[in-house]
Amino acid sequence: MIQSFIITGFLGVGKTTMLTNTVQKYFSDKKVAIVVNEFGDIGIDGNILSNVYSEVLEISEGCICCQLAEEFESGVLEIMNKYNPEIIFVETSGASEPFPIFLSMQNLGISVEGVICVVDSQNLDSYKDNSTAKYQIGGSNIMVLNKTDLVSNDELEAVKKDVIAIKEEYNIKNTLTGEPIFNNYVINQAEQGLVSKEVFDGVYRIDEIIGLAKDYKHHDHTTKDSITQKVAYLKADIEFADVDEVLKTIPKSIYRVKGVVKVKDVPNPIVINYSFGNVSFEELDEYTQPSIMIFIGESIDNDVNLLCEKFDFLNMPKFRVSK
């Protein structure tokens, strides 16, 4: 399954700079596709990214920048078929909302790891009453406060309060159930146009998850930084509702869950993708390894142990796994 991130935010907040810095810093060893969904006929940001990624192309053996104004899904399909990227970043127009892009990516079977809204800490006051800006924040589950070096601590705290207030009021909801699409959200800060690494930790491809499932007798590993990744194996005699109940009780310290599980009431194994409260499922053919769930977060040992105590079909081996 291809992973993706959607980058949204109002006009001039620094999306392109952040995206450029992010890919160069964290994904130079990956095959990355950049999709710029521009507003209007001329895409200046697309030209900037094309120049940057012509250099990354030589390093990572394949980074594609494609500017799409129309026929978004067909354009993304063309990228997938032609280049087979590992990760896709979509930068939306500053004048558009992110959720239609989110739905399109899911329709294409692409795992959306996060919808990131870049907020201009210095200039939020000047655009926070704009309805598009409000729905950009409401339709995201990761808010990144940019240009924090240009404001005081008091001003930054005021920005955080504004963002939280907008998020709570405009948090996008399921029209049928009235429940929020994103149960949880996080607020991060960018320094010098670079977002923190934790936003992107825990991005697993299916083959990596299968590799971990095969490796369940592996020796102890140490984890990087403060991000902990813990693996649980699931007993065979469970139903989909059991897995769903686990995901509904995930604490905020755990911001990603990946895995492949076999349940009695679904014919094929299910791929789980949980990211900051948002959950998606996809069936997977010909999976013969143990059912596995990978929990990723910050200082999560105690929370994962509590989950295993609450749900006796979760078994926690005594080792840690790092990417």
Q: Model-predicted segments: where are they?
A:
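Short, aromatic/basic amphipathic alpha-helical patches
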Residues: 47-50, 160-163, 305-313
